[in-house]
């Protein structure tokens, strides 16, 4: 009987633990616009998924949503992620303004915005972005929306902050291969 139980444990553990899983964040994109997936680029240590409203295109958009997954992340505090973004934008878009809006008590989630982002190659084009950082078990999930505006309105920040906070964290089996 002990051998039978041991055999069952070995077989079932292979079924459950032999599968590769990934952490995901399911964002409830606003229903007033139908959203479509623009692309899903997956590498060995990251994944970037982009979304647009159904009637917009990659070259002609008013709002773009993206989810960046950083796998095997060593960070355990959202402040590390925020500092990385701050350093990046200070070096690459010095006129951009960053403001941290909220950090959870357990330091696993944060919301911040970066406004007046101008690319060096296209200084006449300006964007602003609102970010939501979620620290998973070993994945950092960063959701952000971009608009072609110099500043984000209070209503925009409030609406999207609520959307981000209503995202569902879960796991799923990895079925696709990476691009790398």
Show the residue positions of the predicted features.
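Surface-exposed amphipathic alpha-helical segments
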Residues: 138-180
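Secretory pathway targeting signatures of secreted, lumenal, and periplasmic proteins
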Residues: 34-73
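Sec-dependent N-terminal signal peptides
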Residues: 3-13, 18
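Stable alpha-helical elements in mature extracytoplasmic
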Residues: 31, 78-81, 85, 156, ...
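Short, flexible beta-strand-to-coil junctions
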Residues: 55-56, 70-74, 117-118, 134-138, ...
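Mid-chain, structured segments of secreted extracytoplasmic proteins
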Residues: 63-104
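Signature of long, low-cysteine stretches enriched in small and polar/charged residues
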Residues: 90-132
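Cleaved targeting-peptide boundary
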Residues: 19-25
């Amino acid at each position: 009987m002990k051998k039978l139980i041991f055999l069952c444990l070995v077989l079932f553990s292979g079924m459950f633990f032999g599968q590769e899983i990934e952490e995901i964040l399911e964002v409830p994109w606003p229903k007033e616009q139908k959203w479509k997936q623009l692309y899903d680029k997956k590498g060995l240590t990251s994944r970037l998924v982009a979304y647009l409203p159904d009637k917009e295109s990659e070259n002609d958009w008013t709002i773009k949503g993206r989810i960046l997954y950083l796998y095997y992340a060593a960070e355990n505090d959202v402040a590390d992620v925020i500092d990385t973004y701050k350093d990046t934008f200070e070096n690459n878009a010095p006129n951009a303004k960053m403001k941290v809006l909220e950090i959870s008590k357990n330091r696993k989630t944060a919301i911040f915005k970066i406004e007046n982002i101008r690319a060096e190659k296209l200084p006449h084009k300006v964007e602003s972005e609102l970010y939501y950082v979620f620290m998973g078990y070993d994945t950092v999930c960063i959701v952000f929306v971009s608009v072609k505006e110099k500043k984000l309105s209070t209503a925009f920040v409030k609406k999207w902050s609520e959307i981000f906070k209503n995202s569902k964290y879960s796991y799923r089996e990895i079925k696709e291969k990476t691009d790398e």
